Swiss-Prot record:
Protein name: UPF0145 protein
Family (UniProt): Belongs to the UPF0145 family.
Gene3D superfamilies per UniProt: Hypothetical protein apc22750. Chain B (3.30.110.70)
Keywords associated with the record: Plasmid
Native organism: Enterococcus faecalis (Streptococcus faecalis)
InterPro entries to which the protein is assigned, alphabetical: UPF0145_dom_sf (IPR035439), UPF0145_YbjQ-like (IPR002765)
Pfam families the record matches: YbjQ_1 (PF01906)
Length: 105
């Protein structure tokens, strides 16, 4: 499935189906939270949280694609991510975009 951050697809006719979403919320275990807290004292990248964010984005994208597939979409345009903290150790990620179906295929 084609997924793009572009607002439009050029050179192809399509119809808009609906807005689609993929959502997930993740947290790390207490051991990784303690490690992150210690890293916060000395500075630098907190790899446990970077990995958590990457995994959450992948899951959100997979869910986005699945929702688009379920409504018969051929592509998703104007795809975006949004994320936010629910608490100190929980992160929510949303992938969203516009599901479209190609005409004359």
């Amino acid at each position: 499935m084609l997924i793009t951050t572009s607002e439009k697809l050029y050179g192809v006719e399509y119809e808009t189906l609906d807005v689609v979403f993929g959502v997930t919320t993740h947290s790390k275990n207490i051991v990784k939270n303690i490690g992150a807290g210690l890293k916060n004292l000395v500075g630098g990248e907190i790899k446990a949280y970077t990995e958590m964010q990457q995994e959450a984005r992948k899951i959100a994208m997979d869910r986005l694609k699945e929702e688009a597939k379920n409504i018969g979409a051929d592509a998703i345009i104007a795809m975006r991510f949004d994320s936010g903290s629910i608490s100190n150790d929980m992160q929510s990620v949303v992938a969203y975009g516009t599901a479209v179906k190609f005409k004359n295929q």
